[in-house]
């Protein structure tokens, strides 16, 4: 379920679809718990939905073969309560400012990690961690250029902050499936814009059918 009065947009309407949009407007209920598996890759907190985990394994293997670096998982699936704890900790660290906390951490129910379709990734033996410097690593650069080939998108890109609502995160990949990942990559648009375009196309198609 989503707590927003609006529902997700065609072509995949159910919350288990890979194109389910989650942000500050479209939220997930507290009791939603997806089926997840442990991706067979290096790192911690490796849980993702099965289709996303399989794609992640392929992507990590390709990065090792093509770029010669080992990617590691940092944070995959998170429960509603886990996200709540993370948000509250960030809130404390910024002196209680919700505006500042919202720039960096999703509120509970507004995190793609609860879907089981997102993963924060890093590069082994790199000091960049989950910072903008990850984009300058060999692994980060490879991810930016190639993740779409495996059905992933870089969800929060630089320059899209006003649309996505979140700061630049070169380490955060979201699984949407091959077709949609390629389309978003070629159009160079955030998921919100892509979904809006889909909505408009669906409306046009319905008018034509009438």
What is the predicted function of each stretch?
Residues 1-76, 80-210:
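Extracytoplasmic cell-surface/polysaccharide-interacting catalytic and binding patches
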């Amino acid at each position: 379920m989503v707590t927003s009065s609006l529902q997700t947009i065609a072509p995949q309407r159910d919350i288990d679809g890979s194109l389910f949009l989650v942000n500050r407007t479209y939220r997930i209920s507290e009791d939603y718990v997806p089926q997840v598996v442990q991706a067979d890759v290096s790192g911690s907190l490796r849980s993702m939905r099965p289709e996303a985990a399989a794609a992640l394994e392929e992507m990590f293997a390709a990065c090792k073969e093509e770029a010669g670096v080992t990617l590691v998982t940092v944070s995959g699936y998170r429960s509603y309560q886990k996200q709540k704890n993370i948000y509250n900790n960030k809130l404390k660290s910024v002196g209680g400012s919700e505006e500042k906390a919202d720039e960096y951490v999703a509120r509970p129910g507004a995190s793609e990690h609860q879907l089981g379709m997102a993963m924060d990734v890093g590069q082994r033996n790199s000091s960049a961690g989950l910072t903008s410097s990850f984009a300058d690593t060999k692994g980060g650069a490879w991810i930016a250029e190639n993740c779409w080939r495996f059905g992933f998108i870089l969800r929060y890109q630089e320059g899209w902050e006003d649309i996505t609502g979140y700061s630049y995160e070169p380490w955060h990949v979201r699984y949407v499936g091959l077709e949609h990942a390629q389309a978003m990559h070629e159009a160079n648009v955030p998921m919100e814009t892509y979904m809006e375009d889909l909505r408009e196309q669906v409306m046009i198609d319905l008018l034509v059918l009438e």
